[in-house]
Amino acid sequence: DIWGPTDVYGVRLPLPGDSQTVVFGQVLSGMKPTDPPVAGRKNNPLMPIAWTKSYQLPGQQSQKGKVFTTTMGSSNDFLSEGVRRLIVQGIFWACGLEKSIPLQGLRVDIVPPYHPTDFGFRSDEDWVNKNIKPGDFKQP
């Protein structure tokens, strides 16, 4: 169950190199996960919204790195447990920790309070007025 209100962004196909699509996105006719898909060109072809790829730095012939990429990740997308799990487990995979992911998946509970903001750009003043620091979210 992966759904977010962000758009399904178009990406250049085919994906480069050894990229492997993990999840395809579908444009829906509304803003609810239960809305039907849009017919026609918008979903043909379906666009990848999450994929993996390896890379190799120059001079590092014996080592390959792993990348997990997604076009999702707005603050509203994180309301979906499926989106949170996709991203967290994708990061575990990229770090070589996939064997530590249990069969039922990792817990990805939201650390309260969580108040996502709508899409848009914020002024510097907005962030100063919020006066939020990472330590404010430390769990007891």
Feature map (PLM): residue ranges:
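Short amphipathic C-terminal alpha-helix that caps PH/PH-like domains
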Residues: V83-A94
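Catalytic beta-strand/loop cores that center a nucleophilic Ser/Cys/Thr
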Residues: D1-S62
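A short pocket-lining beta-strand/turn micro-motif at the edge of beta-sheets
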Residues: M47, Q63-F68, N76
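Surface-exposed substrate-engagement region within the catalytic domains
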Residues: N43-L46, D77, V88
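Active-site rim elements
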Residues: P37-R41, G73-E81
